[in-house]
Structure formats: structure tokens, C-alpha cells
């Protein structure tokens, strides 16, 4: 790093090679220790720590934690036995000759010292306090690491894409409101009273227009905005690595994305084996109860619908019956099984049926007595359990029961310590349905259109080749050319082949119940562009915050965003959202009443 007006070196640049030389350093007082008239200070900057020794008591006396100081001194080796192998600078120290206090610090609301970062007694405050004082929270080494990692990942992605002849293009932030599956954030247009801009949920339509424009390979780190109900690990504003290509198919986009992912992970010291595995959406749901399966561990779901087809147990007289094995679960106390019932009810289920295989294969549990002798005798083999295991069941509609069992599978793995954050299990999920029922959207998705069907991904997704001629005749079974990239049970990103023909787009919109007039009003500019020669195109977007959090091993995406929002979109740091003044309301026209003009 280059020399500046305040320093000759950063902390971790002070090595044994500089012994006997003078250096000037600048940073925060991380920690101070006094030993018999000699003060030791750990000086912290963005690179790490270096130990400073102060023999002058008058020089050391005013220094406190988080004071910003500049020191000049001579580098020397630490005395034998005083080396710190945990520090990059652990073999040397700097003997201070002069110290200047550049800024003082009040007592901190919580400690940010590197020395306390990994100590159990260093209890961080609640997240609202951390976010209110985010500038202090970001001083912690783990947060500095996350921000640097995010930057390095972006650099690696850019290099990989530019090596593949992609062009970075910035798209507008003020656009027209278009249906994309969530609510828009809107901004009043002061110069056009009564009219509003929308902040983009994604650059979807704009990047398709770039394909029509002749930009054959586009990317950007795009800011996106979605006005969603609060969910634990979502943000109202987020970043995605957006990529689109012309004259390509699904295989081309997947191959390109794999190269980008490999480059990103390599920047952090990991090798990703290519090509990545694939699983169909149906197999993912059947085997793992999730369209974003965590493949760091096994224990797939077992379908028992056929096994229980003649069961006397009414609960299992359902369209779908499935199970997941709880290894060693027979030793679980009854109260813990009761807690599992509460866990299931919190997820909207009525409960969680179970049996245990005791000694000598004896079947126990509340479900056991309801099964026939034949069902009891063959159950252990049917589910692949062993003596000492337990088995959880779910019955009902296929999707709801599989989702519950999939959640059980992951919860079991979590409790068994199988979710290693440094193990990365990638997979593509392919062959998604084109549509899903409007009354069954994921979480708080807003259904696009006015029919019984809405888009599984978005309304601009191309039907698969086998379905192009008939998707509107059988929407329930129609399949799409779409694909998601999943890692460790998290959806990192998703993409699809896009519709580039106005006749196919019109048929998809018709299935969604979007009239021609509404389509022209919402996104007629895209349909108009298709009339002038739109090349086949496809793309994918990686959720950047999620991708960084996976590689960082962070508990939340908020830990890899510099200034995230808290629950409900609140910003404890700045106080946003906040009321605006009456003058601002009048200027922006948020209360504009067109009828008032007529009067």
C-alpha cells in the first residue's frame, strides 16, 4: 500500500524485514495494557494489529480505547518468549518515539476490540443497537473481513465476465411500474403531478431491451427494490449480479455461470469442481422436500403413499404420505418429541407424527398403535431405518407434506452439526413448471395477472420446447426453460430462457389473465421492441448479498451489507423511513387530487 500523509505503512506491513527502521503508523487504540511503567498498545487499522511499546508514561497516560492516533517509532523483534503466533505481526513490535492523538473517543456503547472478537464474554448487543451504531459495528474484524470479501468477489466476477466479452451497462433506477411478482416502491414525479416512477424490482425488461439493442453480452451489479412484508433474511433493497446473453440457450448460460462461480470462489481460496451437478425440480421436491435442497448431507425423504394405500389409519389416508428418518431418535425423551409438535405447528402443520424403533425392533410411539400388523412389520425396511432410530411422517397434499418433511430434514441436520459453513454443495435445479396456482404463491409473492395461474418465475420465461405449442392448453403441467443455482440449501440465483417472440408472449399473458390493453399499458415498450427483430436470449441473476453470505459463512445477509435495514425496513442509524414536511408533500405532489384541478 502506498505511503500517505499520516503513515508510511499499514499495521500488517510491519514485518521482520523492517527491524531497525523507523515507521509511522495510524489507526485506533484497540487495547491497552500496563506493566510496571511500560504501556503496550495494540494499534488497529484496516489490515490488522501491531503492538506498540511506550516507555514514556506521560506519552501513554491520555490514551484510551478507540482513540485515533499516529505513532512514529522503531521496529524491533519481540523478546524471546513474547511472540504472538496468532498475529501476522506477532514477531515484532514498534517502540514509540512520538504519539499524536488525532481524535478522541467517548465510551463505546459496545466493545469492538479485536482482542474480544472471539471471546465468549464479549456479548454483542441486540441487532438494533448494532445497526444504530453501524459505523462502530463495522470496525469489528469479522465485519471488515466481510466487506473486503464482498469487494474481492465483485472484482473476480467482473474479471471473469469481461474475459468472456461481457459489457457492463448501467440501467435506470427510475422506471415504470411493471408486474414482476412483488410490490413496487414508488417515487412521485414532481414535474408530472399525479404520476409516479417505480424503483426496479430487477432490470429484467431493460436487459431484454439491451439484447434487442445488439448488446449481446451484458452484466451489472444491479440495485433492486422490492416492497415485501418483513421476512427474517430479506432486504427491501438488495444487489444482484445480473447477466444476459443473446443467441444462447439454457446450457450456454449455465456453463457461463459456472465459470463465474468458480472464479468467485477461487478468489477466496476455494476450488469448485465443474460441471456442477443437476437435479430436476420434481426430484428435488420428492427427495429433499425443497426446490433449493441442501446437499451437504444425505437422509432423503421416503415416499410411503403406496405403502399405506390400504391403511386403517385415517391420517395416512391422504394423497401423499412421506417420512424422514431421525437417526438415533429412539433415545429422545417424550418432552422433546412434544417440542417437535410445537415446531411443526409454528410452520402451519397440525403436528408431526412419529414412531420409534426400540430394542428388538419394537415399534413405539403414538402412530404405532394405529397401523396394521403388516404395516408395522415392514415399516423399518420401507423407510431404511435401524434399531434405535425414529421416523417422522407427514401426510396431506404432496407439496405441503414434502415442504414440512424437507424442513424436518434440515432441522435434524442442524441439530446434529452437519451444516458445515465451509463446505459448499452446489446444484442446479432445472425443469421448473411454467405456472403455479395463484392461490399458492411463495411467501408473500404478489400474483401476476388475474387468472387462476401465475408465473413460477416471471411472465417473460420461455416455455420448454416440448410445451411451446400447447402450454396454454394445459397450464397445470406446462414446463419452462428455467433454472436455479443452489448452494447449501440457499437459492443463490435463478434464470431462464426469455420469450423473444411477441406471439408467445401474448399467449403467456393470456394464461395469466393479463389483457392486451393491460399488457400494452404495463410493458408495451417491450412488446413493441419484439416487433423489430429480437434475438433469442437468456440470462441469470445471482443474489449478490446471499452469495456473499454463503461464501463468508455469515449467519445473515445483514452481516455482509454495510448499512442494512432492520425488521420492517427500518434503518436505526438514520431513522428512515421518516415523515416528510408539509412543504415536501406539496412540492412532490403525493397528495395530488386530479379532481381538484377540474374544480
Swiss-Prot record:
Its EC number is 6.1.1.23. ATP binds at residues 226-228, 235, 491, 543-546. Residues 565-599 are annotated as: Disordered. Residues 204-207 are annotated as: Aspartate. L-aspartate binds at residues 180, 226, 457, 498. It is found in: Cytoplasm. Keywords: Aminoacyl-tRNA synthetase, ATP-binding, Cytoplasm, Ligase, Nucleotide-binding, Protein biosynthesis. SUPFAM superfamilies: Class II aaRS and biotin synthetases, GAD domain-like, Nucleic acid-binding proteins. The record marks 35, 81 as: Important for tRNA non-discrimination. One of its GO terms (cellular component) is cytoplasm. Transmembrane segments: none annotated. One of its GO terms (biological process) is aspartyl-tRNA aminoacylation. Residues 590-599 have a biased composition (Acidic residues). Its main location: cytoplasm. It is an enzyme of class 6 (ligase). The keyword Repeat does not apply. One of its GO terms (molecular function) is aspartate-tRNA(Asn) ligase activity. It catalyses: tRNA(Asx) + L-aspartate + ATP = L-aspartyl-tRNA(Asx) + AMP + diphosphate. It holds the Pfam family tRNA-synt_2. Belongs to the class-II aminoacyl-tRNA synthetase family. Type 1 subfamily. Aspartyl-tRNA synthetase with relaxed tRNA specificity since it is able to aspartylate not only its cognate tRNA(Asp) but also tRNA(Asn). Reaction proceeds in two steps: L-aspartate is first activated by ATP to form Asp-AMP and then transferred to the acceptor end of tRNA(Asp/Asn). Homodimer. This is Aspartate--tRNA(Asp/Asn) ligase. It comes from Bifidobacterium longum (strain NCC 2705). The lineage of its organism: Bacteria, Bacillati, Actinomycetota, Actinomycetes, Bifidobacteriales.
Amino acid at each position: 500500500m502506498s505511503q500517505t500523509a499520516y503513515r508510511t505503512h499499514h499495521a500488517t506491513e510491519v514485518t521482520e524485514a523492517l527491524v531497525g527502521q523507523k515507521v509511522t503508523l495510524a489507526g485506533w487504540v484497540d487495547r491497552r495494557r500496563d506493566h510496571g511503567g511500560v504501556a503496550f498498545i495494540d494499534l488497529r487499522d484496516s489490515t490488522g494489529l501491531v503492538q506498540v511499546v511506550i516507555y514514556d508514561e506521560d506519552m501513554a497516560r491520555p490514551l484510551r480505547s478507540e482513540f485515533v492516533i499516529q505513532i512514529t517509532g522503531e521496529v524491533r523483534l519481540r523478546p524471546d518468549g513474547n511472540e504472538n503466533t496468532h498475529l501476522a505481526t506477532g514477531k515484532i513490535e514498534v517502540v514509540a518515539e512520538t504519539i499524536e492523538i488525532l481524535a478522541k473517543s467517548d465510551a463505546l456503547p459496545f466493545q469492538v476490540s479485536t482482542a474480544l472478537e472471539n471471546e465468549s464474554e464479549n456479548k454483542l448487543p441486540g441487532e438494533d443497537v448494532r445497526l444504530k451504531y453501524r459505523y462502530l459495528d463495522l470496525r469489528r474484524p469479522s465485519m471488515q473481513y466481510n466487506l473486503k470479501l464482498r469487494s474481492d468477489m465483485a472484482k473476480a466476477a467482473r474479471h471473469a465476465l469481461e474475459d468472456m466479452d461481457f459489457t457492463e451497462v448501467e440501467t435506470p433506477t427510475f422506471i415504470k411500474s411493471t408486474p414482476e411478482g412483488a410490490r413496487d416502491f414508488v417515487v412521485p414525479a414532481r414535474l408530472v403531478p399525479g404520476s409516479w416512477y417505480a424503483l426496479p424490482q430487477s432490470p429484467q425488461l431493460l436487459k431484454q431491451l439491451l439484447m434487442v439493442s445488439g448488446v449481446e453480452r451484458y452484466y451489472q451489479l444491479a440495485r433492486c427494490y422490492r416492497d415485501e412484508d418483513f421476512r427474517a433474511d430479506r432486504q427491501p433493497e438488495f444487489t444482484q449480479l445480473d447477466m444476459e446473453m443473446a443467441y444462447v440457450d439454457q446450457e450456454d448460460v449455465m456453463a457461463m455461470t459456472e465459470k463465474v462461480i468458480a472464479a468467485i470462489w477461487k478468489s477466496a481460496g476455494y476450488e469448485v469442481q465443474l460441471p456442477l451437478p443437476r437435479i430436476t425440480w420434481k426430484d428435488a421436491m420428492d427427495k429433499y422436500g425443497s426446490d433449493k435442497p441442501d446437499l451437504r448431507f444425505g437422509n432423503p425423504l421416503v415416499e410411503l403413499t403406496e405403502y399405506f394405500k390400504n391403511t386403517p389409519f385415517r391420517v395416512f389416508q391422504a394423497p401423499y404420505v412421506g417420512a424422514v428418518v431421525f437417526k438415533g431418535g429412539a433415545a429422545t425423551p417424550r418432552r422433546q418429541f412434544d417440542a417437535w409438535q410445537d415446531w411443526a405447528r409454528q410452520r402451519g402443520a397440525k403436528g408431526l407424527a412419529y414412531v420409534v424403533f426400540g430394542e428388538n425392533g419394537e415399534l413405539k410411539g403414538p402412530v404405532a398403535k394405529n397401523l396394521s400388523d403388516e404395516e408395522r412389520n415392514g415399516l423399518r425396511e420401507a423407510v431404511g431405518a435401524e434399531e434405535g432410530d425414529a421416523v417422522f411422517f407427514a401426510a396431506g397434499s404432496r407439496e405441503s407434506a414434502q415442504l414440512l418433511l424437507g424442513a424436518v430434514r434440515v432441522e435434524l441436520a442442524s441439530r446434529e452439526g452437519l451444516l458445515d459453513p465451509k463446505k459448499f454443495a452446489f446444484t442446479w435445479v432445472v425443469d421448473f413448471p411454467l405456472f403455479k396456482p395463484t392461490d399458492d404463491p411463495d411467501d408473500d409473492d404478489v400474483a401476476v395477472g388475474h387468472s387462476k395461474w401465475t408465473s413460477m418465475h416471471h411472465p417473460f420465461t420461455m416455455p420448454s420446447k416440448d410445451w411451446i405449442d400447447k402450454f396454454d392448453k394445459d397450464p397445470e403441467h406446462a414446463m419452462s426453460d428455467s433454472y436455479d443455482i443452489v448452494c447449501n440449501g440457499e437459492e443463490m440465483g435463478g434464470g431462464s430462457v426469455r420469450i423473444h417472440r411477441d406471439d408467445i408472449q401474448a399467449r403467456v399473458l393470456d394464461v395469466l389473465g393479463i389483457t392486451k390493453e393491460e399488457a400494452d399499458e404495463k410493458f408495451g415498450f417491450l412488446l413493441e421492441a419484439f416487433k423489430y427483430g429480437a434475438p433469442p436470449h437468456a440470462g441469470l441473476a445471482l443474489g449478490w448479498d446471499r452469495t456473499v453470505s454463503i461464501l463468508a459463512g455469515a449467519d445473515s445477509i445483514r452481516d455482509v451489507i454495510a448499512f442494512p435495514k432492520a425488521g420492517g425496513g427500518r434503518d436505526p442509524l438514520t431513522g428512515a423511513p421518516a415523515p416528510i414536511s408539509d412543504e415536501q408533500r406539496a412540492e412532490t405532489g403525493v397528495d395530488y387530487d386530479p379532481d381538484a384541478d377540474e374544480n
